[in-house]
From Swiss-Prot:
Substrate binds at residues 56, 143, 155. This is Glutamate 5-kinase. CDD domains: AAK_G5K_ProB (cd04242), PUA_G5K (cd21157). It catalyses: L-glutamate + ATP = L-glutamyl 5-phosphate + ADP. Pathway: Amino-acid biosynthesis; L-proline biosynthesis; L-glutamate 5-semialdehyde from L-glutamate: step 1/2. SUPFAM superfamilies: Carbamate kinase-like (SSF53633), PUA domain-like (SSF88697). Its EC number is 2.7.2.11. Coiled coil: none annotated. It comes from Rhodopseudomonas palustris (strain BisB5). GO terms for cellular component: cytosol. Its main location: cytoplasm.
Amino acid sequence: MARPKLHDFRRLVVKVGSSLLIDSGAGEVRADWLAALAADIAELHRGGRDVMIVSSGSIALGRSRLKLPRGALKLEESQAAAAVGQIALARTWSEVLGSHGIGAGQILVTLQDTEERRRYLNARSTIAKLLEWRAVPVINENDTVATNEIRYGDNDRLAARVATMASADLLILLSDIDGLYTAPPGSNPDAKLIPEVESVTAEIESMAGAAGSELSRGGMRTKIEAAKIATSAGTHMLIASGKIDHPLKAIAEGGPCTWFLTPANPVTARKRWIAGSLEPKGTLTIDAGAVSALRAGKSLLPAGVIRVDGQFARGDAVIVRGPDTHEIGRGLVAYDADDADRIKGRSSPDVMMILGISGRAEMIHRDDLVVGTAPG
């Protein structure tokens, strides 16, 4: 598989860990380094790319602001430190991106936000709107409310979930090491950097070591887990050193890193999941005009729906049938069954009047629709 280039990608997630962002001695943001990273992000943004940031650092900053001693914190202490640190972290990102004329939007998520369908859809919609407005979403785990039972515990896997949620085509994990090695490079002089990984095998997993610095909760093992999540969803991933200034520029110029490649892309992977992995909860029957529109690559609008069957929630998979009951495709519906039935056959301006809210224009967006999935 040909090794891609950074500028081949249109939507990127950049994960920044605590050990890069925070000076472990002073407990403060590494301002010069962050300014250089922000300049890299601004360059990508000016090129028309969508950029999202998954940023650690709230607990580390909170510890510094509260002058807490070194060592392990109890859960409630970590949560309280995060509450203080998150304010400073959000301000830092807002100011450094704002210096380039870029707005930043803070999103705090928990594991449940990516596991529960409704919350997942709400988070995805918020990210999509921020990107549409050309803002940069800055995402972190909501450490103030996450417990040990319902937390990611590291932002590598969170970043992979965000990349999947946002249909990003590249996830960049900036680390204190420039990629995956055949052995720990600090203790083995014969260790070699692996430039490309086309499949995460048991051998690849065995090369991952334990967690690193005091400030970071992640390590190479969590990065390998992130690679499995990302590549299965059609998102390429790379691990590169963030210790240098302008780390994204270094990647673009061919600097050392490890690519985790996937033959799929986010849209095809998502559509394969919709077509083959989800149990349909209902059926939408559509008119002949809507059938033609769907086959031409359009979204399904409420006006084209003539019948709604089944009990389904927003985001559930449904079968789409033509007026002759032949299956046209499958998709993720934007309304629950009751609301879908109320707005079927109606034009988009009528939807707000009927539902009393400004609803989505599409019953099923084309990115959530697979046409031609009927058996046989």
